[in-house]
Regions:
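Core catalytic region of metal-dependent phosphoesterases/phosphodiesterases
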Residues: 2-71
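Active-site-proximal beta-strand elements of phosphoester/diester hydrolases
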Residues: 2-8, 75-81, 123-128, 151-153
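Hydrophobic/aromatic beta-strand patches that form the interior of the parallel beta-sheet core
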Residues: 29, 51-53, 77, 107, ...
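Glycine/small-residue-rich loop that forms an oxyanion/phosphate-binding "nest" at active or ligand-binding sites
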Residues: 51-52, 57, 63-101
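Active-site environment of divalent metal-dependent phosphoester hydrolases
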Residues: 10-14, 35-39, 57-62, 84-88, ...
Length: 156
């Protein structure tokens, strides 16, 4: 299962839509800022499941602040990350939250810095910003039948 993960688009959707169209992903994730940009994904790819959460710049109650989903048997925590102080470079509270929820994968955003790490048995993936700055990026996460997880940060 391939999952295209975007975050922090801040109204800039063209590159995100192009990448999503080229990937042939099985699911799409938008991790907030701006949550309404997820609507663009939904309209462009109505056949794909879309998972969304809101970020610190989002006010719409349509998207939850966080979400726990199962991708091919792998439990994942989806959140923007701002409530876990990820912008201070600390990921321990995010790892703890994932462990408490029985998740082995966390998809988060907020920092505008891509991250792909494993801490305490939890894979942490931040796709970076899809909408701001010169280093725009997204993540492609692959879930294998044996429960393995691979993640790759790709430029936009």
């Amino acid at each position: 299962m391939k999952i295209a993960v975007f975050s922090d688009t801040h109204g800039s959707t063209a590159r995100m839509l192009r990448a999503a169209g080229e990937l042939r992903a099985d699911a799409l994730v938008h991790l907030g800022d701006c949550e309404r940009d997820a609507d663009c994904l939904e309209r462009a790819f109505p056949e794909l499941p879309l998972y969304r959460v809101r970020g610190n710049c989002d006010v719409s109650p349509r998207a939850p602040e966080e979400l726990v989903v199962s991708f091919g048997g792998v439990r994942a925590l989806l959140c923007h990350g701002h409530r876990y102080a990820v912008d201070w470079g600390r990921l321990d509270s995010l790892v703890y939250a994932a462990q408490e929820k029985g998740c082995s994968l966390v998809l988060y955003g907020h920092t505008h810095r891509a991250e792909n790490a494993e801490i305490g048995g939890v894979r942490l993936v931040n796709p970076g910003t899809a909408g701001m700055g010169p280093a725009r990026s997204f993540a492609l996460v692959e879930i294998f039948e044996n429960g393995g997880v691979a993640a790759e940060i790709r430029p936009l």
